[in-house]
Amino acid sequence: MARALVLLSVVLVSLLVNQGRASDNQRLFNNAVIRVQHLHQLAAKMINDFEDSLLPEERRQLSKIFPLSFCNSDYIEAPTGKDETQKSSMLKLLRVSFRLIESWEFPSQTLSGTVSNSLTVGNPNQITEKLADLKMGISVLIQACLDGQPNMDDNDSLPLPFEEFYLTMGDNSLRESFRLLACFKKDMHKVETYLRVANCRRSLDSNCTL
């Protein structure tokens, strides 16, 4: 009888601990979604402010660049389209999101310089800090998803493709400045989508349609 009571106590404690972890992970997921939403909205505002600051001739030049044909993040293997995203596991979506956020830690410093003269985007230097915080949160979610298993994602060891390209951004040309802003917006939209679907994956009864 005593042994049964001890066993029951252990089971109850384990359940409470697991419930606490699940609650913490849910809060972390919600915070991650909110943070990347803010970054996506900030990216959209930066592009609008950038375009508003241009002369008519410069805007005509931009019309020749858009739609955007290439971003350096295209090197990162990621789900494309709604169907592939919805079929991806929560762990895969978290890993891709981590990779995309990580890839912007260095170029976000150039991004800050691109919009440093804007008075409406707040302090652009905070973008790098926001990315670092989001990266840390996603890393914790990945570890929780692995539940003690080793991380076997080969892509984690691949070099990031951004650093050399953005070293050429020193001339701050119109084309490259716009490309940088547009790519940042594109990638933040990706991460927002992936995190939303990954968060939805936590509930088996949820309809995770996009």
Swiss-Prot record:
One MF annotation (Gene Ontology) recorded for this entry: growth hormone receptor binding
Cell compartment(s), UniProt: Secreted
Gene3D superfamilies found in the cross-reference section: 1.20.1250.10
Keywords attached to this entry: Disulfide bond, Hormone, Metal-binding, Secreted, Signal, Zinc
Signal peptide, first to last residue: 1-22
Main location: secreted
Function: Growth hormone plays an important role in growth control and is involved in the regulation of several anabolic processes. Implicated as an osmoregulatory substance important for seawater adaptation.
Stated name of the protein: Somatotropin-1
Organism: Carassius auratus
Taxonomic path: Eukaryota, Metazoa, Chordata, Craniata, Vertebrata
